[in-house]
Amino acid sequence: MRLFILILSAILLLFQYDLWFGKNGYLDYKETAEEIAMHKAENTKLSQRNQVVAAEIRDLKDGVEAIQERARLQYELVKPNETFYRIAKENKDNR
C-alpha cells in the first residue's frame, strides 16, 4: 500500500510540475497574457492614429480649407494681394 501511495504522489508531483512549469503551463499563460495586453495597447494607439490620418485624408479630399491651411503652414504660401507677416518669438537667452 505504501508503494502505491508513493507512486500516486510521484505522478501527482509530475502533473503539478507540468502544470506550473511545463509547456503551455501557468507561467507560459501569464507571459502570453502580458504580451496580448501589450499588443492590445499598441493596436489601440495605432487605431487612434489611423483615425486621425483618415480624418485628415477625408478633409483634404472634401474641403478646400484644409488644403489652404496645409499650404500656409507647411509651404508658407499666400493668396494673391495678401501680405505675409512672420512674428519671431524672442529668445530668452539672447536678451
From Swiss-Prot:
Protein name: Cell division protein FtsB
Topology relative to the membrane: Single-pass type II membrane protein
A GO CC term attached to the entry: cell division site
Functional summary from the UniProt entry: Essential cell division protein. May link together the upstream cell division proteins, which are predominantly cytoplasmic, with the downstream cell division proteins, which are predominantly periplasmic.
Single Gene Ontology BP annotation: FtsZ-dependent cytokinesis
Gene coding for it: ftsB
Main location: membrane
Cytoplasmic topological intervals: 1-3
Domain of life: Bacteria
Family per similarity comment: Belongs to the FtsB family.
Coiled coil: 28-62
Stretches assigned to the Periplasmic side: 22-95
Subcellular localization: Cell inner membrane
Transmembrane parts of this sequence: 4-21
Self-association and partners: Part of a complex composed of FtsB, FtsL and FtsQ.
Record carries keyword rRNA processing: no
Signal peptide positions on this chain: none
Keyword annotations: Cell cycle, Cell division, Cell inner membrane, Cell membrane, Coiled coil, Membrane, Transmembrane, Transmembrane helix
